[in-house]
């Protein structure tokens, strides 16, 4: 089996897409939190959003690294 070469050319785009979708999911969860009276659901959504925000921090760092590497020709 032949290994695929490491093709990182679209990593920045993929990470940006994931950031955008994660932000959208946070916003949708915030809307649900505001609308629901179920405390268990609120707690679950709040916890998910906390994890999403942590993931966003990581993705933002990763996109900076990838953008820098892309600029430098992935050396």
Swiss-Prot record:
Family annotation (HAMAP family): Tlp (MF_01506)
Protein name per the record: Protein Tlp homolog
Family, similarity comment: Belongs to the Tlp family.
Chain positions covered by the region annotation Disordered: 53-75
Taxonomic lineage of the native organism: Bacteria, Bacillati, Bacillota, Clostridia, Eubacteriales
Naturally occurring in which organism (per UniProt): Clostridium botulinum (strain Hall / ATCC 3502 / NCTC 13319 / Type A)
Pfam family, one: Tlp
């Amino acid at each position: 089996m032949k290994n695929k070469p490491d093709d990182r050319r679209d990593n920045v785009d993929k990470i940006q897409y994931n950031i955008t979708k994660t932000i959208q999911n946070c916003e949708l969860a915030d809307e649900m939190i505001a609308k629901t009276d179920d405390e268990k659901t609120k707690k679950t959504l709040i916890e998910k959003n906390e994890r999403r925000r942590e993931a966003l921090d990581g993705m933002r760092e990763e996109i900076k690294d990838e953008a820098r590497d892309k600029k430098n020709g992935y050396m």
